[in-house]
Amino acid sequence: FEDARGTLFFDVARIIRAKRPKAFMLENVKQLKGHDKGNTIKVILSILNELDYYVPDPQILNAYHFGIPQNRERIIIVGFNKDYLPKKFKDFKYPVGKIDKKVCVGDILEKEVGERFTISDKLWEGHQARKRMHKKKGNGFGFCLFNKDSKYTSTISARYYKDGSEALIEQVGKNPRMLTPRECARLQGFTDDFIIPVSNARS
């Protein structure tokens, strides 16, 4: 709870207290579980229990285990309003995912993609230079390159469209490209009937 992102939970708790939903689901980076030696998650669970919600132990789930070709691990916290729980209710069990070997990056790629998504020579050269620099330092940081046969991409974040380094797609005979907004939506589990109401640049 050291910055604005950390205090956001208290806004969530305030909304839950005011609206009393039958159920809720919260998602965060998996590192939350060990943040501040586990004290942060203890505070969160304590507050949710004080709101009179049944909250089972949070679980870390990976999108790739649920049919999405993205290696995205997140801690999931669910809660159920005790006023609506059945009398014979025992406990909630999180779904158990599995690896589907048929799932691959090609599943989310669009057939036709505009040239504007191909990164410039300058950006591509910069990515490669930083990759070489990180390699000399002995770490694996730098851009990540994938193709249609890759099993999954790395995790994409809100900053993806700054340079696309988290997940670039190989192209024959030219620089790699960034994912389109539709492809990003598919990686987040949205079906194609989900409307992206803004331009490519803003989305």
Predicted features along the sequence, with ranges:
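Class I S-adenosyl-L-methionine
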Residues: 1-155, 159-161
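Internal anion-binding site segments
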Residues: 148, 157-158, 162-171, 179
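FAD-binding beta-loop-beta segment adjacent to the flavin cofactor pocket
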Residues: 167-170, 174-202
